[in-house]
Amino acid sequence: MTQNILFVGGAHLERSVRQRLEQNGFAVSSVSASAPAIQVLTDSLIDLVIVHLDERQNGTDLIRQVRHVLGTKTTGVLAIADWGTGLPSVALAAGADAYEPAPIVPERLIDAVKRVLHKRATVVGMNK
């Protein structure tokens, strides 16, 4: 079964990263801002939200909104941010399941995506 990923952030999701995720069986969509992300989340079945944080946007508010809108649904949240900015800690405190440092390295991102999805499935008893 294909798992759906929503990438949110001002930073452009590189074509090579998208292709690598798709080659690993993930369907990837992307939006650049919080408002369309919340709309996608309410209208679609999304398994994982990847939020690319930077200091110009308040992606941590999006993480809180995702948790509020989805409640106890199984959707995971993975934050990407530059180390040393404090954003990784803030993202985890806001409800992100995991953090990956920027810049995005495809292999590392794929491993993180799989870990978060596995963890979320285990939490809700879907992974036997």
Please describe what each predicted stretch is.
Residues 104-113:
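C-terminal output helix
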Residues 73-86:
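A short, hydrophobic beta-strand element within the central beta-sheet of small alpha/beta folds
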Residues 114-128:
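The C-terminal output helix
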Residues 47-70, 84:
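Conserved phosphotransfer microenvironments
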Residues 11-30:
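Two-component/phosphorelay signaling modules centered on CheY-like receiver
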Residues 61, 83-99:
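Alpha4 helix (beta4-alpha4-beta5 surface) of REC/receiver domains from two-component response regulators
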Residues 42-44, 67-73, 94:
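Conserved phosphotransfer cores of two-component systems
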Residues 32-48, 55-56:
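Acidic, metal-coordinating helix/loop segments flanking the phosphotransfer/catalytic sites
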